[in-house]
Swiss-Prot record:
N6-succinyllysine modifications at: K285
Annotated source species: Homo sapiens
Single GO cellular component term: cytoplasm
One Pfam family per UniProt: dNK
Gene3D superfamilies with a match to the protein in the record: P-loop containing nucleotide triphosphate hydrolases
Assembly behavior: Complex I is composed of 45 different subunits. This a component of the hydrophobic protein fraction.
Protein name: NADH dehydrogenase [ubiquinone] 1 alpha subcomplex subunit 10, mitochondrial
CDD domains: NDUO42 (cd02030)
Length: 355
């Protein structure tokens, strides 16, 4: 049900991307609601990816354990390379890209809580897996946004984590007994039918910070919820990164690894990036036709999230039909959520009958 709401929010997000260049004049919504999106005629008339993609059109992800400085390094790399920075996708990522950008209630965001996970990771209500499932969907949505930006503008992108590294948290949760084996099977099923449509990043940057140092940083940060994270959980995250993620990604893309001290020198990291040849991975096999189909996919947010809801009964992520209907109607009653963007009088949209 929550993923159904995520699809609805994502659909309006794509309209918001189209409207990014539109202007409001005296409260009248400029009409971008004709749904002009990239399609077959654009491709046939010459709007092809090869005309805008350059050597600077790269997808870079910065990965690492909790509190390793990923955000700072990713932002600095993006600034120095002239790329677009995508901060890490959290629970409220769909909210940040739709409507007025303000966070919505938990009922509309997977009915999960990161703070509750830190406080009680073994909660019997299934919060831990709902959280992981929702975050995967949020990262999937963000990765599609990043690829859409790359294919539309040619500008490179830098993300903090991605759908390709999301599983490290699932493995850590399972190893610590926070979730059931059925949850792992459900996650892997969803992942297998979604991630296959996406190209991996051109480059993965991994910040290697020992668990004791991670814990010291968490304590220094002072978040009362994060301070309850155990060293065993952090160690399992690190193990998943080093034993599974990095070896797998090294076959698909370039990988750079830095210590905590080295990661502080973003200038040196950028120099290392400039020396990379980027001579491996599936991006080299792409042509205008394959990139055309990829762009069609990533601009259709409903299709992006379509297979995150699969017909498998799992108590952690399944709710009844009546509750689904009630929450859906409540969501539709929120300001600006009843109709497509530009058609909601309660948020000031005018001249709707002319659109």
């Amino acid at each position: 049900m929550a993923l159904r709401l995520l699809k609805l929010a994502a659909t309006s997000a794509s309209a918001r991307v189209v409207a990014a260049g539109a202007q409001r004049v005296r409260g009248i919504h400029s009409s971008v609601q004709c749904k002009l999106r990239y399609g077959m005629w654009h491709f046939l008339l010459g709007d092809k990816a090869s005309k805008r993609l350059t050597e600077r059109s790269r997808v870079i992800t910065v990965d690492g354990n909790i509190c390793t400085g990923k955000g700072k390094l990713a932002k600095e790399i993006a600034e120095k390379l002239g790329f677009k920075h995508f901060p890490e996708a959290g629970i409220h990522y769909p909210d940040s890209t739709t409507g007025d950008g303000k966070p919505l209630a938990t009922d509309y965001n997977g009915n999960c809580s990161l703070e509750k996970f830190y406080d009680d990771p073994r909660s019997n209500d299934g919060n831990s897996y709902r959280l992981q499932s929702w975050l995967y969907s949020s990262r999937l949505l963000q990765y599609s946004d990043a690829l859409e930006h790359l294919l539309t503008t040619g500008q490179g992108v830098v993300l903090e984590r991605s759908i390709f590294s999301d599983f490290v948290f699932l493995e850590a949760m399972y190893n610590q007994g926070f979730i059931r084996k059925q949850c792992v099977d459900h996650y892997n099923e969803v992942k297998s039918v979604t991630i296959c449509d996406y190209l991996p990043p051109h480059l993965v940057i991994y910040i290697d910070v020992p668990v004791p140092e991670v814990q010291r940083r968490i304590q220094k940060k002072g978040d009362p919820h994060e301070m309850k994270i155990t060293s065993a959980y952090l160690q399992d995250i690190e193990n998943a990164y080093k034993k599974t993620f990095l070896p797998e990604m090294s076959e698909k893309c370039e990988v750079l690894q830095y210590s905590a001290r080295e990661a502080q020198d973003s200038k040196k990291v950028v120099e290392d990036i400039e020396y990379l040849k980027f001579d491996k991975g599936p991006w080299l096999k792409q042509d205008n036709r394959t990139l055309y189909h990829l762009r069609l996919l990533v601009q259709d947010k409903f299709e992006v999230l379509n297979y995150t809801s699969i017909p498998i009964f799992l108590p952690e992520v399944t709710i009844g039909a009546h509750q689904t209907d009630r929450v859906l109607h409540q969501f539709r009653e929120l300001p600006g959520r009843k109709y497509s963007p530009g058609y909601n009088t309660e948020v000031g949209d005018k001249w709707i009958w002319l659109k």
